[in-house]
């Protein structure tokens, strides 16, 4: 066996080993990836609906949608992660974004 053949074999073996290690995470990655993509698509569509001739109203409407996207993504990560810091940040984000959403919606209803 030539040196080049041994290198190719080693590279293929390493790739196969890494694939085997990754397989348990693939189901999660596919599920979370789909949820994140759905959240982003929903947020983007809602932000476009928020366009308004008044730049202040447009900003407020788009921020409501943006905050909802952050809330949705935080809920996704909470279903999947056990990391304490990420969990705290996601939970805090949900609380703060929900509160700010309400403030913005109140402002929008008055203007």
Regions from the PLM with identified roles:
Residues 16-21:
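Sec-dependent N-terminal signal peptides
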């Amino acid at each position: 066996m030539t040196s080049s053949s041994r290198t190719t074999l080693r590279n293929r073996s390493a790739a196969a080993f890494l694939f085997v290690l990754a397989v348990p995470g693939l189901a999660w990655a596919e599920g979370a990836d789909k949820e994140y993509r759905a959240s982003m698509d929903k947020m983007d569509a809602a932000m476009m609906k928020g366009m308004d001739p008044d730049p202040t109203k447009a900003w407020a409407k788009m921020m409501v949608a943006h905050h909802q996207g952050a809330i949705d993504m935080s809920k996704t990560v909470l279903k999947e992660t056990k990391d304490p810091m990420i969990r705290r940040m996601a939970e805090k984000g949900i609380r703060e974004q929900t509160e700010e959403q309400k403030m913005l919606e109140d402002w929008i209803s008055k203007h």
